């Protein structure tokens, strides 16, 4: 497989693909194609087919050279990874041998000022991973103070969320907040940080990004979709980058890897048979060398599991946190 251009090294890529254990003739799904790092490693590990999904059309366009160099073994699909099962069915692969997911924003997106993800690069306050739906500027312009506070607290775990929300409401009365620098400067007036600590706007930007892209809902649905498409013995590998994501993955795999017993009085409460066997009792983390080469790897956690022959469980109900549709509807 030959290809020009710099090679992207995915976080915990070797470890994630090692968990998948690709084999000749297998079909694998990269739910978050990005720069194609995991896909390349899977294609190089064995004579496999890969279906790669990304909601960012720029990532899909940038992957064209890789498609050309892999002689029909790679299919790129512009879609959300929550639609993974439908994508596989459309590609004639109703069951697959492995699924890998790298959750959150990509380094390419963060490094592009015009995507509006970074408080360090001034650009339009966008933050969308795809090309549709409300932007972060729309949310900041229309959400109520209470909704903003909840969003920033729940998705950013920012203890000063009410102060930040109040400052945003006050600032937008004077002028629209449409750039990343404008928002970062507003947050910095109420959230202080000492030298060596994270930037004051870190948690607020994380919260808005997660909210705008409905990332946690997407993750819930993608995990459930992977459960449905993986064949017995198929493997799931998920790399997450903060506690909210990791908690969802850990809980999902934990719930689906144990059998809860009912009582003789309520035998109907017996849970479904385990649909996964957990392969990582503790998450795999990056070593010192990888962290030195890529500081983003410091917070990464990799969890893996193998599909059993049991039927997929009923999809979980989504938590009752604020939704993009409800907040935007209330703010109009």
From Swiss-Prot:
To which protein family does this belong?
A: Belongs to the methyltransferase superfamily. RsmH family.
The protein's name in its UniProt record: Ribosomal RNA small subunit methyltransferase H
Which gene underlies this protein?
A: rsmH
* Major location category of this protein: cytoplasm
Q: Which GO terms describe its biological process?
A: rRNA base methylation
* Enzyme class, first EC level, given as a word: transferase
List membrane-spanning regions.
Answer: none
The Swiss-Prot or TrEMBL record annotates one GO molecular function as:
rRNA (cytosine-N4-)-methyltransferase activity
Q: Where does S-adenosyl-L-methionine bind?
A: 36-38, 54, 81, 102, 109
The job of this chain, per UniProt, is described as: Specifically methylates the N4 position of cytidine in position 1402 (C1402) of 16S rRNA.
Listed NCBIfam families: 16S rRNA (cytosine(1402)-N(4))-methyltransferase RsmH
Q: Which domain of life is it from?
A: Bacteria
| Assigned keywords, A-Z | Cytoplasm, Methyltransferase, rRNA processing, S-adenosyl-L-methionine, Transferase
Name the InterPro entries on file: RsmH (IPR002903), SAM-dep_MeTrfase_MraW_recog (IPR023397), SAM-dependent_MTases_sf (IPR029063)
């Amino acid at each position: 497989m030959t290809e020009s251009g710099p090679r992207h090294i995915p976080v915990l890529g070797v470890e994630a693909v090692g968990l998948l254990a690709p084999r000749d003739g297998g079909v694998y799904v990269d739910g978050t194609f990005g720069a194609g790092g995991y896909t390349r490693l899977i294609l190089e590990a064995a004579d496999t087919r890969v279906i790669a999904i990304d909601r960012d059309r720029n990532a899909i366009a940038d992957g064209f050279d890789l498609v050309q160099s892999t002689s029909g073994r790679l299919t790129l699909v512009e879609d959300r990874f929550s639609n993974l099962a439908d994508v596989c069915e459309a590609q004639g692969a109703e069951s697959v041998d492995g699924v890998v997911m790298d959750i959150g924003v990509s380094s390419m997106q963060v490094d592009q000022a015009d995507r509006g993800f970074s408080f360090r690069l001034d650009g339009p306050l966008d933050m969308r991973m795809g090309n549709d739906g409300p932007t972060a500027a729309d949310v900041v312009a229309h959400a109520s103070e209470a909704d903003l506070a909840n969003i920033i607290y729940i998705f950013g775990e920012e203890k000063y969320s009410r102060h930040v929300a109040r400052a945003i409401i006050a600032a937008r009365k004077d002028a629209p907040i449409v750039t990343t620098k404008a928002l970062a400067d507003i947050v910095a007036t109420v959230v202080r940080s000492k030298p060596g600590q994270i930037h004051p706007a870190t948690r607020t930007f994380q919260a808005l990004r997660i909210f705008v892209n409905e990332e946690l809902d997407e993750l819930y649905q993608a995990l459930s979709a992977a459960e449905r498409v993986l064949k017995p013995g198929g493997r799931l590998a998920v790399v997450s980058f903060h506690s909210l994501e990791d908690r969802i993955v850990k809980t999902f795999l934990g719930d689906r890897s144990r059998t809860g017993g009912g009582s003789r009085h309520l035998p109907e409460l017996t849970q479904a048979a385990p649909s996964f066997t957990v392969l990582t009792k503790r998450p795999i983390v990056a070593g010192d060398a990888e962290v030195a080469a890529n500081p983003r790897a410091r917070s990464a956690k990799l969890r893996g599991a193998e599909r059993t022959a049991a039927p997929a469980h009923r999809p979980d109900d989504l938590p009752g946190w604020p939704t993009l549709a409800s907040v935007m509807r209330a703010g109009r």
